[in-house]
Amino acid sequence: KLAAKAKGLGIPVFYYISPKIWAWKEWRVKKIKKLVTAMYAIFPFEPDIYARHGMQVEYVGNPSVEELETRLEAAPSREDFLKANRLRDRKIIAMLPGSRRSEIRNNLQVMCRAVDMMPQYRGVIAGAPGIEDEFYRRLTNLPVLHGQTYSLLRHSHAALVTSGTATLEAALARVPQVVTYRANGSKLSYNIMKRLLKVNYVSLPNLIAGREIIPEQLLHMCTPDAVGEKLAAILPEREPRRLQLEGYDDMRARLGQNHAADRTAELIIKALTNK
């Protein structure tokens, strides 16, 4: 609505961070093309999607890269992290079950049962903002850490991650992972989703790399046994783990070195001054 209003007043519209038209509703590009002077994307695969509709979009870099690198550098040492959270010195499997109650409810119990199959590892949950401990306690007795997601990733051996931005964060932190998305767990929902989605993957690392570098266990395939099998494969220092880490390197290279906000500002100034 704001873009349409500005366009009607003759004000140039610069759009930083594209809506996720690549997931579904790609038809929105037609409306965006009419209203937006320039679009700046934060994922390297987005310009090609817009190009199919005759719209030129510039990839400016991804802000998560520098933010995560800064946060990881600020993370406490492993010794201090374990001591502060009263955790024993065992290899950690980070569990990021989502930020909404429905997501957490659908995914966490699958994650917990998968981690139970790895008794030599310790599952630790990244608590979502605004979700109280009591909610998690009704689902599991595993430790829940609030406001420490980046420290948790920094000191984890592997991760179970519900699809979303957290998959990119785990990849940038170089934590081998399995992606889970349970929802209602039905095969019918899976078939509907596959028809609606305009992309081959749901996780950002796979979308950015343009190939599967991390396993995605979705809906009816998101069972404790299936997730546990994929998790067990990436725990030892063997080929599945090595290949995933190499995939992360490829993904990171595709993201580039640009400071996204600075690059966007430069392009907007250039467009406004016609330089």
Locations of regions flagged by a protein language model:
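Nucleotide-activated sugar donor-binding and catalytic core shared by glycosyltransferases
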Residues: 1-275
